Amino acid sequence: MSLIKEFKAFASRGNVIDMAVGIIIGAAFGKIVSSFVADVIMPPIGIILGGVNFSDLSIVLQAAQGDAPSVVIAYGKFIQTVIDFTIIAFAIFMGLKAINTLKRKEEEAPKAPPAPTKEEELLSEIRDLLKAQQEK
């Protein structure tokens, strides 16, 4: 039973939950970027390069024989995946850069010392009066 309690304590910690949310959002963001690259970026690039569909670019190593499909190196899909990765990596870099900038600004702004309480003010006045009496 203690194993279950330990797991609940582990899973309910803020860092684990934040990580899970990050993974889910990251997966969704990856799908969005993949669609953006495949459906928005690559078609115009293909038109510019003479009507090339990048997802179809491949080198046939062995032609199809009977029921066996052909063996190919699909380098067009690889190019799309590299572009996906580059966009995702750049977005993560920009996000981390923004977070680091905000953290630096927080660190640079020194906190004002807290105002003295009434007790501290009274004690300071008493101290000053005692010093004045000793000097006489």
From Swiss-Prot:
InterPro entries: Mechanosensitive_channel_CS, MS_channel, MSC/AndL, MscL_channel. It comes from the Bacteria. Its main location: membrane. Belongs to the MscL family. Channel that opens in response to stretch forces in the membrane lipid bilayer. May participate in the regulation of osmotic pressure changes within the cell. One of its GO terms (molecular function) is mechanosensitive monoatomic ion channel activity. It is a multi-pass membrane protein. Keywords: Cell inner membrane, Cell membrane, Ion channel, Ion transport, Membrane, Transmembrane, Transmembrane helix, Transport. The chain crosses the membrane at residues 9-29, 79-99. This is Large-conductance mechanosensitive channel. It is found in: Cell inner membrane. Homopentamer. The keyword rRNA-binding does not apply. It comes from Shewanella putrefaciens (strain CN-32 / ATCC BAA-453). One of its GO terms (cellular component) is plasma membrane.
